[in-house]
A protein has these predicted regions:
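Gly/Pro/Ser/Thr-rich low-complexity, intrinsically disordered segments predominantly at protein N-termini
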Residues: 1-190
Length: 190
């Protein structure tokens, strides 16, 4: 089912009946259409997912790539009609399996990775940063394919603050997963 042109505020109940091919996020009830990812975006996402999945094999945490619905502020008694914010991070790392259900993740993932594109750069750096901070995401990676860099932000005193900056030949430490390191030369295709 397509988005209703008459309706101005949406919930997770609406989201659940939309066409799966549409890439839409809900931000405080507003439907935000997302552009389809580029080939470079998908290659970077695939390599990050592969390295994370290899590290997490046999462990309790899971790395889940988009499309994957994350209801950042869903409460225990909320119904789909109550939830007004649903995002689809490029990669979500969840260590509390009780947050996982048939529709995605209830609450904040431990770590979120967003891969920038020209159309999402502002959205990922401002809107989503604010949402992830409010929700209590512990670690947020902002990956820039054009600059071949990774910016790592960690939650400190309820604020996501810059912690580390890595370039294409670096080895990035995943703070949310003890002992996990990502080889960026493989992520950026070298």
């Amino acid at each position: 089912m397509a988005l209703s042109a008459e309706k101005t505020s949406f919930t997770f109940a609406d989201y659940l009946v939309w066409d799966e091919d549409e890439h839409i996020e809900l931000i405080d009830g507003e439907a935000v259409r997302m552009a389809p990812p580029s080939t470079v975006h998908q290659l970077i996402s695939g390599e990050l997912s592969r390295q994370l999945a290899n590290f997490l094999e046999g462990k309790k945490c899971r790395a889940i790539p988009a499309p994957f619905a994350v209801r950042l502020f869903e409460g225990a008694d909320d119904t789909p009609a109550d939830v007004q914010t649903v995002v689809e991070p490029d990669i979500s790392v969840i260590c509390d399996r009780s947050k996982l259900d048939e529709h995605g993740c209830k609450g904040a993932p431990d770590m979120v990775i967003e891969i920038l594109s020209p159309s999402t750069r502002r959205h990922d750096r401002l809107v989503k940063l604010n949402l992830y901070q409010r929700a209590g995401v512990k670690e947020y990676w902002i990956v820039s394919p054009s600059d071949q860099t990774v910016e790592v932000l960690l939650l400190k005193d309820s604020w996501l603050v810059p912690h580390a900056f890595y370039e294409k030949d670096g080895i990035a430490k995943v703070n949310a997963l003890e002992g996990c390191f990502i080889e960026l030369c493989k992520v950026f295709g070298e």
